[in-house]
Amino acid sequence: FKDIKLELNNLTLFTGVNSAGKSSAIQAILLLLQQRQSENGLLNGKYIKLGRFQEVRNTIINARKIDIGMTVKNADDEFECSIAINSEEKITKNNFEKIKGLDFVYLCAERIGVEDVYKQNLEKEYRIGIHGEYAFDYLSKERMNSIAEQDFRNMEEETGSNFGNQVDYWLNYIMGYSITAERIPGTEI
């Protein structure tokens, strides 16, 4: 894309035919968000690994620079942040102080397969992991936490008001089973 504007919400789903630009749009967003982890900027980081500038630039127009930006709006604020990548792979960042606090979860299409045991998440940011590798750890830690009533998609009296009961309800409703995740004391699994 030379220029595209996308409106994103709490859950955004990209659909379309092959080579329509879904992955390119997602990679641009991920590239911006992974700049939170580095002062110098990253083409290769936690969310994506793009390689080198020469591999991602538009060779048809002989691009010597890549510019990517986004505007973030929420109830309290609106701000823009952007990056520019030149042929020497120098990344110039603009206004990334505010994006550091942006709540963002990315679950890659390539997820972890079936394992005998799953590792605990020992990272500072407590999530399910980019590949879902910490999903069971997250479930074991959050199982008993209450969920706000407005977040229920079914009747509370049918399932209870905690995260684990809601997960079990929906797994049973969709696939006919429930799940238990427990930590093994004295280990990181």
Regions found by a protein language model. Name each.
Residues 35-189:
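Phosphate-coordinating catalytic segments in nucleotide- and nucleic-acid-processing enzymes
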